[in-house]
C-alpha cells in the first residue's frame, strides 16, 4: 500500500522525530511511504486569521502536491481536519471543489489510518511507563477520531494508562488563539498541567504537536518531570 506523508509545519520545523517515527511505523506495517516535496502549509493559520485568499492559494498547492497519492496520512488531527474542510471552502468553485473532495476522501490521521484502513491495533510497541493521554479538540470534536488512539495504546506492552481529569478540556493552544488571547491561553494550559500532575504520570501522550508543544512548554517552565511524547513516537518504541 502506497502512502504519502503529509508532515505538517510543526513536525517539519520543530518535531522532525515525530515525522521519522510516523514513517517507521507505517513502513513496519507494510506501507510504502513517500514525501511529496511540493507540500507546504495546509493554510489553516491564514484561514483562521481571516486571510482567506492567501489560504486558498496554499490549499490549491496542497491539492496539487497530493493529487497522485493513493492515501495521505498525517500525524496531526488538526491538519487532517483542515484537509477534510477543503471541499466546503471551495464550494463556489466546482473544479477545485471536486479536487478538494478527492483529497479529503483519501486523507487520514495516523491512528485512524492504522486502525480503520490497515485494520491493526497492535503494532508491537513496547514502553514501560505510566502515562496519561491528552485528547486534542480538533481531532476528537471535528475529525471524530477518539477511540483509535486508545485502541493502539492499550496494546503497547508495559504501558500503564491512567485517565486524565478533564481530558476533553482544551489545552489553550488553538493555533493563533494562544497568541491573540495569551492570558486566557496561559490560564487554560495551567489547568491542563495541574490535571497532568494529578495523574502522577511519567509520560504525557498526544496526537497533535501543537497541543504537546504548548503543554510540554508549560511543564518545563514549572520544572515538572513529565516526558511529552507524540503517539507516533510511542507506537515506534521498542
From Swiss-Prot:
Role this protein plays: Is involved in L-lactate degradation and allows cells to grow with lactate as the sole carbon source.
Lineage: Bacteria, Bacillati, Bacillota, Bacilli, Bacillales
Encoding gene per record: lutA
Cellular component, GO annotation: cytosol
InterPro entries: Cys_rich_dom, LutA
GO biological process, one term: lactate metabolic process
Domain of life: Bacteria
Organism whose genome encodes this protein: Bacillus velezensis (strain DSM 23117 / BGSC 10A6 / LMG 26770 / FZB42)
Pfam families documented for this protein: CCG
One MF term in the entry's GO annotations: oxidoreductase activity
Protein name per its UniProtKB record: Lactate utilization protein A
Family note: Belongs to the LutA/YkgE family.
Amino acid at each position: 500500500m502506497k502512502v504519502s506523508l503529509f508532515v505538517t509545519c510543526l513536525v517539519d520545523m520543530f518535531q522532525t522525530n515525530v515525522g521519522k517515527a510516523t514513517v517507521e511505523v507505517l513502513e513496519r506495517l507494510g506501507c510504502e511511504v513517500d514525501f511529496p516535496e511540493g507540500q507546504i502549509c495546509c493554510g489553516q493559520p491564514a484561514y483562521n486569521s481571516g486571510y482567506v485568499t492567501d489560504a486558498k492559494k496554499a490549499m490549491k498547492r496542497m491539492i496539487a502536491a497530493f493529487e497522485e497519492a493513493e492515501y495521505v496520512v498525517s500525524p496531526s488531527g488538526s491538519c487532517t481536519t483542515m484537509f477534510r474542510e477543503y471541499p466546503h471552502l471551495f464550494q463556489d468553485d466546482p473544479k477545485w471543489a471536486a479536487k478538494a473532495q478527492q483529497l479529503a476522501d483519501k486523507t487520514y490521521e495516523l491512528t485512524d489510518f492504522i486502525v480503520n484502513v490497515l485494520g491493526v491495533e497492535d503494532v508491537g510497541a513496547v514502553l514501560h511507563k505510566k502515562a496519561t493521554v491528552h485528547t486534542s479538540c480538533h481531532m476528537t470534536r471535528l475529525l471524530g477520531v477518539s477511540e483509535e488512539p486508545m485502541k493502539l495504546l492499550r496494546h503497547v506492552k508495559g504501558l500503564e494508562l491512567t485517565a486524565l481529569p478533564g481530558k476533553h478540556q482544551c489545552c489553550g493552544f488553538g493555533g493563533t488563539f494562544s497568541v491573540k488571547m495569551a492570558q486566557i491561553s496561559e490560564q487554560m494550559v495551567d489547568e491542563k498541567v495541574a490535571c497532568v500532575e494529578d495523574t502522577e504520570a511519567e509520560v504525557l501522550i498526544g496526537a497533535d504537536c501543537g497541543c504537546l508543544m504548548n503543554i510540554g512548554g508549560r511543564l518545563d517552565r514549572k520544572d515538572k518531570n513529565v516526558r511529552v511524547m507524540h503517539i507516533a513516537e510511542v507506537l515506534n518504541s521498542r
